[in-house]
Amino acid sequence: MASPPAHRSSKAADEELPKASSTFHPSLWGSFFLTYQPPTAPQRANMKERAEVLRERVRKVLKGSTTDQLPETVNLILTLQRLGLGYYYENEIDKLLHQIYSNSDYNVKDLNLVSQRFYLLRKNGYDVPSDVFLSFKTEEGGFACAAADTRSLLSLYNAAYLWKHGEEVLDEAISSTRLRLQDLLGRLLPESPFAKEVSSSLRTPLFRRVGILEARNYIPIYETEATRNEAVLELAKLNFNLQQLDFCEELKHCSAWWNEMIAKSKLTFVRDRIVEEYFWMNGACYDPPYSLSRIILTKITGLITIIDDMFDTHGTTEDCMKFAEAFGRWDESAIHLLPEYMKDFYILMLETFQSFEDALGPEKSYRVLYLKQAMERLVELYTKEIKWRDEDYVATMSEHLQVSAESIGANALTCSAYAGMGDMSITKETFEWALSFPQFIRTFGSFVRLSNDVVSTKREQTKDHSPSTVHCYMKEHGITMDDACEKIKELIEDSWKDMLEQSLALKGLPKVVPQLVFDFSRTTDNMYRDRDALTSSEALKEMIQLLFVEPIPE
């Protein structure tokens, strides 16, 4: 290895804070969510009462559905899930899914039905074969679908993205239908609901969309459909607006916590992104019962952001090593190990973890021990990356991912979400499984790492950073940065296939475990698809406005 380059001296670390970097723009939201309430707040009690009535009305519709009317039943389940209502009907939907899976007596020549059935079952954990699409292939390599049957074309395109390795028929379906949908889009009225659906799918296939954002965007489209169910539509609007009220209360709480953290710790150099971090984590745990998960996740993400900025940008190597030594002690007595500017943050971090235990109560406070273990491992890996940086060491891609797929925080995030869940199916065994960093979680971690690196490498190459996976791939294969980024995008695509295959093979775990990992993947894809939206958060402003500021008109 090369000898370590000269780094910033920590001589004055106890006397002054690290200087703020001009890289990070200030918060776009300031104190907005400390005081904001959506205009629907005064009607909350009436909204809840009406929503309860509608939920039971829709439940009757769902209970009246049978596989004898398969197209209608499949479409109803898909609609409820897209509108963000699936959570309320898990038992009814699970029963119907089993019947749909077991019933092979359906019209296998109906491309729309075949596509929707395949999509629905694979999305919900059924390993159905893809050869159901072979009969639709033409001699020219395309798929038989009448030019006017645009709905079937779109359904096939979205279904094909639930693909596994080696499923050539789905590879071909994607390439064939994408071209036809792109051509179709040019002939549709841009503002028509179907044009919006096609455009959304070409940008992000249905399976990869963030659930709560999809609900917000799909409700106005569903409202225009001739076959809409009025009770379902009204419930979807009320449900979203009620969730928005909860989200704003949680944002107020998290914003107040963050402001106190920064004011007392005086760490003004870190990225001020608590609203964006809540938005990101909300995308993984948006269902109504997961309020505590959203709060824990947001605070953990805030803590990780501070630690990451200390290690990656502002702290000296010596200071970061001192922090790592103190971190695992989880005790105020360890502050003597720290430079002055880290001491207040360390105390506030301990108080935050204690607040998690208090919120969980005696029966579930044990979960915080697992969360602490995940965070200890994260900081340990940060120190390894600092050593690589100081030694100018560029690992191979495989060696890098052995560390960085975990140091991206995959375990800390999954354990944070599981910790806050009221679901008693989350047990000690669930946490022990997650902390063992099984292949499914490792693949998710690699996905997050690669997604982050491919959009942040060019920005970070001008600073004193550890080499990214992009740099590792460039050196290992002797190619340009642009070529390496294209290859990494292929690896990201492969990660979706890997995660699907691995999730279908999982046994003995609560259903929420793989669901959560996919929801994390979706919200991460939304954050990093075209840009690093956490660091440069202007791209998120409109989405945040839609989710947390603007109610859906009734």
From Swiss-Prot:
Mg(2+) 3 binds at N452, S456, E460. The keyword Magnesium applies. Mg(2+) 2 binds at D308, D312. GO terms for cellular component: cytoplasm. It comes from the Eukaryota. The Asp-Asp-Xaa-Xaa-Asp/Glu (DDXXD/E) motif is important for the catalytic activity, presumably through binding to Mg(2+). This is Inactive sesquithujene synthase B. It comes from Zea mays.
